[in-house]
């Protein structure tokens, strides 16, 4: 098949990687298979037709890529967010190529998520849980944005991000017109329970991918990019988020 991406979210996320999955009431992305497209086309002209909310949703995955792998890209987004939203071709081409390059580099080393590919789940432990608990009222990128804020707090507590770096990520998400707080209608106890449907859970233990500074990921031991986190810690972070 050919993947023709007409949204920023598809360009940043689904177009490269080969995951073909379905969402269920239980959770997202648990039922599916790996099937690589023969070709991928990114139609950045179509981005101009998107509502602001949809464009922002795609920007969350773009920011995630910058956070995990490319500080220069992060700084570009800080300077050119308005240009991207205005449809500036050069800025849009830059992020389209960067998204593909970053994700392709990971997927080609670990197509079926045996280790390295877990880094693409940065922010998704809380993000996917809140997306489901919201009954999909939150778009994927909106939920991911909140998950990124939770992740940076964890990274800060573990000593991998400074307060300034944590704030920089939050500020960039806000600049992209993304939510950074848990909506009042979300049942936080239900959110904590939903964390356990995450595909990174092992032996009943929550596991998180953790950012290192801006543009890096913590490798906890050789080939291991997710670390167990006690429920009490995850709960405390969630309960203290506004």
Descriptions of predicted regions:
Residues 23, 100, 209:
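Residues in well-ordered beta-strands of folded domains
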Residues 1-82:
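A glycine/threonine-rich phosphate-anchoring loop and its flanking beta-alpha core
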Residues 49-54, 89-90, 137-140, 201:
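Structural motif
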Residues 60-62, 160-242:
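C-terminal charged capping/lid subdomain of soluble metabolic enzymes
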Residues 29, 36, 116-117, 206:
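A generic hydrophobic-helix recognition signal that picks specific residues
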Residues 15-16, 30, 56, 121, ...:
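Short glycine/serine/threonine-biased micro-segments
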Residues 75-190:
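Active-site segments that bind and position negatively charged phosphate/pyrophosphate groups
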């Amino acid at each position: 098949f050919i993947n023709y991406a007409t949204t920023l979210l598809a360009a940043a996320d689904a177009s490269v990687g080969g995951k073909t999955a379905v969402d269920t009431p239980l959770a997202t992305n648990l039922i599916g298979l790996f099937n690589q497209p023969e070709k991928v086309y990114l139609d950045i002209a179509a981005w101009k037709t998107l509502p602001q909310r949809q464009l922002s949703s795609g920007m969350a995955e773009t920011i995630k890529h910058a956070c995990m792998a490319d500080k220069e890209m992060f700084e570009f987004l800080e300077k050119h967010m308005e240009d991207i939203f205005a449809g500036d071709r050069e800025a849009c081409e830059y992020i389209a190529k960067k998204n593909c390059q970053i994700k392709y580099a990971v997927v080609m080393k670990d197509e079926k998520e045996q280790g390295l590919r877990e880094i693409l789940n940065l922010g998704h432990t809380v993000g996917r849980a809140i997306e489901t608990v919201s009954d999909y009222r939150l778009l994927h990128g909106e939920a991911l944005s909140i998950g990124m804020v939770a992740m940076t707090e964890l990274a800060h507590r573990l000593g991998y991000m400074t307060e300034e770096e944590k704030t920089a990520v939050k500020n960039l998400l806000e600049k992209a017109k993304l939510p950074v707080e848990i909506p009042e209608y979300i049942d936080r106890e239900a959110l904590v329970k939903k964390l356990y449907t995450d595909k990174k859970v092992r032996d009943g233990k929550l596991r998180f991918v953790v950012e290192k500074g801006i543009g890096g990921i913590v490798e906890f031991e050789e080939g291991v990019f997710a670390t167990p986190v006690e429920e009490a810690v995850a709960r405390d972070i969630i309960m203290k988020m506004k």
